[in-house]
């Protein structure tokens, strides 16, 4: 890299980040400093990736934290001699862009590209070491052609299918949502609307085919946060049990199947509960019961976001328990879900808390079949007994441990035809159909003769129409665009219609990390050999909110495409860091529930509402417009510089914890960089002048420098960036205190080392001060320093002296003392003579550097 023609020469010693940062960003771009090196057989690779952003139009502090963390890691690995791939792109399709475009009466394409341009310029202000040559947006036709290509690959392998299904319908965004996109309150993750149910013909991916592998391979992900793995484990929701068939007494040929993980409790079943939509409902003829069920359906619809009462409706239907032939009443219950298991569950009130509550409320028998101790008998229970124990009231299984009985009873059922061993998953197939314009078109043609026909890969891409109508509240759906929709069937050649649904945006983000290693490839989504070289991603950084959606889908895609022999990797992300939120002070009036802008508050140290003079509560919450607590990164960079923003973000809190914004802390980092600047300015003026050499100060500085190298290296590897900066500050203090009392060679070595250690954190000032002290090539092309273990050794150590195993004294010993010298020194000490005088010393054991034991 070429040094700038004219070095920045300040008239004063003041640190001027805006000029420094602008200059070096330009030079780095001109010199392609961060272009990815080609991988060779002898080079080590490191793939550093942030979850790519949705181009909303403006960078926020959450973005800054994400990308600065990844950039630090990428820079460090580059210093360590790795070939680093650190790309950036845009997750550009989706409802927010479409809705924003509708509001403004412009095309989503125009809106999105404008936002990308603005956000890219903001990102560049941070001085990221990104290889921008590999940039793409998922809405680019030369990207989504390959999303369509991969859809067809999955179709060929039987992982894509279409069916009519009751789906989650967002009435605000007018589109279907996957189960994962509906929150625990039954609301859309995007719009916040209460989700409705609707019957539509939809496209699905068979993610359930990979449920077991997705679950088992979580064990391979040693460098993922435990909470993310637990969230995926729970979402996949594997249950090992059995399907039990209960005959219906009025029709022995008809049975009801119930999934259970507790066959050991079958003798305690006192009722069966079915959902309001179970097929057996049709067998009910009593009009009053039918009306009660309809009322319950309405209640469930009206209260789907609230905690439900345990409502039960007893039917005239009776099931027969296969283990003892006892009749069991069938109830319709509010708590039984259609979508889990078979839509029917067995009620064991004595050994299930929910069933116990339901039975008590509806006067249903409670039969205890498990006790804690073999000697116990059944008693009236105050609550359900849910622990392990021994069977009672269970015929020939009495006395067996329930864990063994569980297997034995299931085995009996399998042998006699009334049970089937079953593994059940909570995970459901991935619904990918969306009824909106701004998404990747599905490469399917609907033919009256042939049905749904996949396009040939040579017919791709299916492009979005550009001549779209935008009204006050919607973009004209693809199905209403006759010029676009009409086509011919690729199978029979007659007139047909294109599929009018677009894909869920998670389809685009489930494989984007595979595109970067060969982003310019024009004949396929990616080069197999490049994927096998660069993948998995060595460090992935993003929010924990993507634990179930994006991260699970990306793992599924990777495994499915591997099985199509497109590459050889099993998991996409080797190491995952989920950064915490960036929070800022918000001022809330608890009387009105409204937030007040800090600009409207006269005294922030004692905030009151300017309208009613109420005292305001100060809360640190996630930055948002509605709470008036957003901090504009661009204004911070303009005032303090990107390096200060980076240092604050990295220093304020551990990366996985939430970070509270504080102007005082930002100013503290600016002052630290200013002190560094002043030190190097002064050193640059007399870099070659001789200093008075003080051996003690030199030795101390060498030790401080090597401690810094060791600790900062370990801290970065362990994602402890805040403590790394603390070590950097300690090294700076040692350097500044001794700079005039050390020999010139050590001075240059220490200044050089400090500069390299600073560079991943604050790359602009590090580059500038590097050149100020006379170096020509970029500091970012240097090698990371190695620490000298010898320099960390102490001159002396504390020796613990024992007599017959009891501590009697402690003494400082020089490292170079021999064992004889240690004995001579210690045996004369009064505290030792007190215990050894006039006694025979039988043995002396010395563990050098630690302990000495005298046996008398």
UniProtKB/Swiss-Prot annotation:
ATP binds at residue 625. It is an enzyme of class 6 (ligase). GO terms for biological process: leucyl-tRNA aminoacylation. A motif ('HIGH' region) lies at residues 53-63. Keywords: Aminoacyl-tRNA synthetase, ATP-binding, Cytoplasm, Ligase, Nucleotide-binding, Protein biosynthesis. GO terms for molecular function: aminoacyl-tRNA deacylase activity; ATP binding; leucine-tRNA ligase activity. It catalyses: tRNA(Leu) + L-leucine + ATP = L-leucyl-tRNA(Leu) + AMP + diphosphate. Its EC number is 6.1.1.4. GO terms for cellular component: cytosol. A motif ('KMSKS' region) lies at residues 622-626. Coiled coil: none annotated. InterPro entries: aa-tRNA-synth_I_CS, aa-tRNA-synth_Ia, Leu-tRNA-ligase, Leu_tRNA-synth_edit, M/V/L/I-tRNA-synth_anticd-bd, Methionyl/Leucyl_tRNA_Synth, Rossmann-like_a/b/a_fold, tRNAsynth_Ia_anticodon-bd. It is found in: Cytoplasm. PANTHER family: LEUCINE--TRNA LIGASE, MITOCHONDRIAL, LEUCYL-TRNA SYNTHETASE. Belongs to the class-I aminoacyl-tRNA synthetase family. This is Leucine--tRNA ligase. It comes from Prochlorococcus marinus (strain AS9601). The gene is leuS.
């Amino acid at each position: 890299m070429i040094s700038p023609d004219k070095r920045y020469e300040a008239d004063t010693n003041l640190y001027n980040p805006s000029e420094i940062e602008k200059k070096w960003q330009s030079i780095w771009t001109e010199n392609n400093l961060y272009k990815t090196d080609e991988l060779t057989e002898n080079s080590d690779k490191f793939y550093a990736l942030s979850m790519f952003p949705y181009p909303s139009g403006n960078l926020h502090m959450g973005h800054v934290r994400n990308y600065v963390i990844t950039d630090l890691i990428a820079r460090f690995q580059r210093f360590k001699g790795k070939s680093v791939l650190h790309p950036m792109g845009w997750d550009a399709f989706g409802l927010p862009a479409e809705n924003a475009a509708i509001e403004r009466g412009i095309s989503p394409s125009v809106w999105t590209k404008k936002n990308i341009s603005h956000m890219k310029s903001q990102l560049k202000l941070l001085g990221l070491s990104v290889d921008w040559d590999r940039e793409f947006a998922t809405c680019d036709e030369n990207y989504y052609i390959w999303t369509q290509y991969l859809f067809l690959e999955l179709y060929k392998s039987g992982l894509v299918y279409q069916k009519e299904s009751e789906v989650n319908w967002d009435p605000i965004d007018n589109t279907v949502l996957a189960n994962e996109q509906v929150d625990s309150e039954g609301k859309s993750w995007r719009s916040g609307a209460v989700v409705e149910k609707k019957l539509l013909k939809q496209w699905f991916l068979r993610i359930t085919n990979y449920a077991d592998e997705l679950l088992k391979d979580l064990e391979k992900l040693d460098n993922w946060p435990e909470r993310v793995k637990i969230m995926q484990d729970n979402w996949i929701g594997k249950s090992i049990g059995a399907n039990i068939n209960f005959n219906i007494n009025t029709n022995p040929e008809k049975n009801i199947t119930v999934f259970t993980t507790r066959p050991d409790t079958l003798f305690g079943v006192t009722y069966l509960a079915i959902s309001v939509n179970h097929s057996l409902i049709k067998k009910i003829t009593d009009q009053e019961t039918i009306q009660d069920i309809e009322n319950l359906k309405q209640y469930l619809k009206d209260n789907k976001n609230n905690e439900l009462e345990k409502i039960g409706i007893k039917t005239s239907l009776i099931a027969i328990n296969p283990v003892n032939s006892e009749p069991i009443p069938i109830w319709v219950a509010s708590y039984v879900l259609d979508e889990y298991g078979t839509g029917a569950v067995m009620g064991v009130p004595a050994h299930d808390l929910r069933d116990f509550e339901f039975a008590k409320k509806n006067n249903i028998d409670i039969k205890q079949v498990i006790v804690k101790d073999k000697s116990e008998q059944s008693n009236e229970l105050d609550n359900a007994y849910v622990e392990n124990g021994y069977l009672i009231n269970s015929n020939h299984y009495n006395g067996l441990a329930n864990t063994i009985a569980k297997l034995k009873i299931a085995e009996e059922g399998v042998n006699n035809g009334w049970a089937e061993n079953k593994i059940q998953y909570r995970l459901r197939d991935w619904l990918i159909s969306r009824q909106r314009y701004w998404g990747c078109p599905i490469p399917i043609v609907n033919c009256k003769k042939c049905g749904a026909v996949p396009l040939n890969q040579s017919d791709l891409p299916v492009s979005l129409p550009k001549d779209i109508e935008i009204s006050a509240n919607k973009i004209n759906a693809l199905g209403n665009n006759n010029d676009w929709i009409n086509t011919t069937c690729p199978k029979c050649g007659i007139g047909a219609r294109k599929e009018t649904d677009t894909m869920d945006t998670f389809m685009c983000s489930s494989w984007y990390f595979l595109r970067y290693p060969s982003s310019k490839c024009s004949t396929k989504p990616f080069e197999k050999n490049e994927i096998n070289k660069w993948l998995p991603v060595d460090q992935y950084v993003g929010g924990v909110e993507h634990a179930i959606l994006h991260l699970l889908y990306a793992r599924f895609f990777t495994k499915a495409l591997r099985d199509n022999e497109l590459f050889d990797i099993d998991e996409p992300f080797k190491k995952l860091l989920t950064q915490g939120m960036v929070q800022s002070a918000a001022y809330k009036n608890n009387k009105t529930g409204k937030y007040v802008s800090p600009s409207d508050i006269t005294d922030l140290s004692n905030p009151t509402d300017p309208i009613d003079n109420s005292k305001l509560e100060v809360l640190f919450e996630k930055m948002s417009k509605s709470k008036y607590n957003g901090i504009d990164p661009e204004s911070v960079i303009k005032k303090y510089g990107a390096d200060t923003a980076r240092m604050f973000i990295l220093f304020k809190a551990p990366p996985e914890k939430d970070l509270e914004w504080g102007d005082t802390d930002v100013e503290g980092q600016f002052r630290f960089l200013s002190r560094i600047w002043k030190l190097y300015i002064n050193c640059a003026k007399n870099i070659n002048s001789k200093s008075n050499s003080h051996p003690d100060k030199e030795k101390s500085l060498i030790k401080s420098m090597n401690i810094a190298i060791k600790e900062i290296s370990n801290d970065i590897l362990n994602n402890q960036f805040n403590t790394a900066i603390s070590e950097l500050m300690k090294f700076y203090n040692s350097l500044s205190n001794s700079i005039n009392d050390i020999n010139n060679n050590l001075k240059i070595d220490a200044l050089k080392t400090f500069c390299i250690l600073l560079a991943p954190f604050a790359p602009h000032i590090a580059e500038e001060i590097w050149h100020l002290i006379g170096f020509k090539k970029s500091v970012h092309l240097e090698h990371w320093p190695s620490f000298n273990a010898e320099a960390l050794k102490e001159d002396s150590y504390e020796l613990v002296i024992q007599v017959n195993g009891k501590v009697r004294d402690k003494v400082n010993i020089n490292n170079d003392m021999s064992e004889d010298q240690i004995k001579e020194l210690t045996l004369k000490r009064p505290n030792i003579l007190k215990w050894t005088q006039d006694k025979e010393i039988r043995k002396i054991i010395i563990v050098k550097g630690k302990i000495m034991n005298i046996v008398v």
